Amino acid sequence: MDNRTLFEMRSIVKAFSGVRALDGVSLAVRPGECVGLCGENGAGKSTLMKVLSGVYPYGTYEGEILWDGAPLRAHSVRDSEHAGIVIIHQELMLVQQLSVAENIFLGNEITKPGGRMDYDAMHRKAEELLARLRLTDVNVAAPVMNYGSGHQQLFEIAKALAKNARLLILDEPTSSLSAKEIEVLLSIIEDLKRGGVACVYISHKLDEVKRVCDTITVIRDGKHIGTRPAAELDINGIITMMVGREMTSLFPKVEHTVGDVVLEARNVTCWDVTNPNRKRVDDVSFSVRRGEILGVAGLVGAGRTEMVSALFGAYPGRSSAQVLVEGKPVKVHSPAQAIAHGICLVPEDRKRHGIVPLMGVGENITLATLAQYARGLRVDKGAELMTVDREIKRLRIKTASPALSIASLSGGNQQKAVLTKMVLACPKVLILDEPTRGVDVGSKYDIYQMIADLAASGVAIIMVSSELPEILGMSDRVLVIGEGELRGDFANQGLTQERILAAAIHAEPRLRAA
């Protein structure tokens, strides 16, 4: 690795309405080095990256930025990109209807004399860039929409390389990727490092940070906590720096008793929304007991989300199932019916299905239980506010006011609010679909504690997760779904990630717990 400093931020201060979002943060990166930037949601990572990438222009912050030893005064994103600094956002910025090549060169087109676009040159160059990323089977003239999220993430990197990126900022790059796609991406980042490209890697997945990063910088509450070689830190050490307190285990151990069967699902079947002849879930049956945490594992696209959506009456296509609650058959054709029978769901995509962005934090929290505060034709705002204040304190939801728009909260705090909303409905069965996706480690712990406490109180938990450590750390029993079928039903005693993956890909026969 080149020992000279490519990029350095010195004592950066950024304030909004007098409140410091960044308070003297420093960061340095060498050519071919990958620096992990860690911190809880709201710590200041996004603000720092906006300063770094030119979103917040020179003059709107205090401190100094050096590029190749000289002051860098970027007044726009284009200025930063011209210097060689490119950010790849968590939400991919590709135009789905345009071709792969058109996306790679969008805003950076190769033209012929006279100004017309040189498609032949762009296609050739796009193929060369993708070959650097081990993609040799891509039709660069085809629309981006023809390719999955794993390919699209690499198209974004190719787009950055087309701009001669020397510093690549990757913001939660694996949040929507499968385990196999993550392996490919991390190995490609290693290739880029060997080629001299520097990276800033932002992720809540600390195992990835440890694996791909050379050094780790932690910020907390807008302050620089420290920078250490990755080899000197274990995951618990990173967490301690991030949250400011020692956490001996991410997964809380709360004594709970598993009781009688509270929900039984028989022959759950879901047909594809666009192809009614294809089944997304095929004849899956299972049960969950009072006080039990049932983990549901499987590869991306296995049908887990479709299955739990059908149990909640929210699957958009055709579905069928026999559902029994406490031994009695119930009809669940809508979320309202499900909630009435004590079945609640915290959805996978909280931004689309979990929150109402324009409403306040408090309004979102009481949305499912508003009838409890009805006094004739009016709402008892005093009683509602008492509930909201109690829950905000209990779950440590960071908000300046319950009236503040929920869209202004970090992902972790939004998720806590969505969870609280459903818990207030007093569920017998609580279904959690990817409950900690995009959530920082401190909020994860709070959510895990809430799940464990709910199980201890007798609530049956069904937890869908793509994070196997989460499944193994929280579950009493694990279902494995593969290609819409039940591939395994395991007691979580001596269970390993390898065994779960083997069942998910059909590498061993269908198994059930003894």
Swiss-Prot record:
The reaction(s) this protein catalyses: D-xylose(out) + ATP + H2O = D-xylose(in) + ADP + phosphate + H(+)
Instruction: Briefly state the protein's biological role.
Output: Part of the ABC transporter complex XylFGH involved in xylose import. Responsible for energy coupling to the transport system.
Quaternary structure, per UniProt, is:
The complex is composed of two ATP-binding proteins (XylG), two transmembrane proteins (XylH) and a solute-binding protein (XylF).
Q: Which UniProt keywords apply?
A: ATP-binding, Cell inner membrane, Cell membrane, Membrane, Nucleotide-binding, Plasmid, Repeat, Sugar transport, Translocase, Transport
**Primary location recorded for the protein, binned into one broad class:** membrane
Q: Give the Gene Ontology MF terms in alphabetical order.
A: ABC-type D-xylose transporter activity; ATP binding; ATP hydrolysis activity
Q: Does the keyword Transport apply?
A: yes
Question: Looking at the keywords, is Translocase present?
Answer: yes
High-level lineage: Bacteria, Pseudomonadati, Pseudomonadota, Betaproteobacteria, Burkholderiales
Recorded topology in the membrane: Peripheral membrane protein
Pfam families recorded for this chain? ABC_tran (PF00005)
Occurrences of domain ABC transporter (ranges):
7-246, 263-508
Write down the EC number.
Answer: 7.5.2.10
Query: What is the species listed in this Swiss-Prot or TrEMBL entry?
Result: Ralstonia nicotianae (strain ATCC BAA-1114 / GMI1000) (Ralstonia solanacearum)
Q: Which Gene3D superfamilies match?
A: P-loop containing nucleotide triphosphate hydrolases
Know the name of this protein?
Xylose import ATP-binding protein XylG
Under the heading InterPro entries, the entry gives: AAA+_ATPase, ABC_carbohydrate_import_ATPase, ABC_transporter-like_ATP-bd, ABC_transptr_XylG, P-loop_NTPase
Where in or outside the cell it occurs: the entry states:
Cell inner membrane
Classify the source by domain of life. Answer: Bacteria
> What do the Gene Ontology cellular component annotations say?
plasma membrane
